[in-house]
Amino acid sequence: LTSERVQFAIESAILAEGGRSDDTIVAGGDQACDPHERGHGPLRSRELIIIDIFPRVLKTGYFGDMTRTYLRGRANEAQRQLRQAVFNAQQAAIKSVKAGVEGSHVHQQVLDVFDLGGYETTRGKNGSTGFFHGTGHGLGLDIHETPRVSGLVSAPLKKGTVVTIEPGLYYPGLGGCRIEDVVQVTARGAKLLSDHHYDWEIR
C-alpha cells in the first residue's frame, strides 16, 4: 500500500460525488512531520499516517477540509499518548469556540493541553518539532480565508463564520499526528459540520 494509491482512491471517490480534491495529503512516518508534505511511497505498519483532504464542491464552489491520523496495526504507548494529546487539544479548542471569542484564545487552549502533556515545541534551521502552526483558519470559497485561529493574529470570531480546528504534533522518529474538523461559530458555541468518526487504529 502506498501514499499514491490512497490519494488516487480518495480523489476518485470525491470526483464521483461531484467534487474535486487536488494535493490530497497521505503522509506516513517522518513524512507526516512536515504538515505540507503530500506523502509518497509505502505506508508502513505501525507508523502514524496523516490523511488531509480539502475537496471543493464543483456545483457551489465551497471547500471542505478534514484531517484524520491513522495507524496500521497496534500503536505503541508513545504513539497512543501523542494521538490522545492531539485529540484532547482539538476538543478543548472546539469547546472554546463562540461568537465574540478571540481566535488567539482558542489557540491558547491547544497550547495549554500540549504544555500540560509535556509536548515541547522547538524551531531551528533544520526544521521544527512539536506544535508549530496555527490552530485553524476560515473556510469557504477559498481553502484559507479569514479569520485565522492562531496566536499571531487576534480577532473576535463572528457569528456564522466557518473555521477549521486542526492542532497537530510532529516529532521525527515518533511521527506526526493532526486531527481536523470544520465548525460554524454560533452565539452559543461551535456547531460541528464535519461528520466522520475518530477511530484510528486499523487492524
Regions found by a protein language model. Name each.
Residues L1-R203:
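Active-site neighborhoods and metal-handling regions in enzymes and metal-associated proteins
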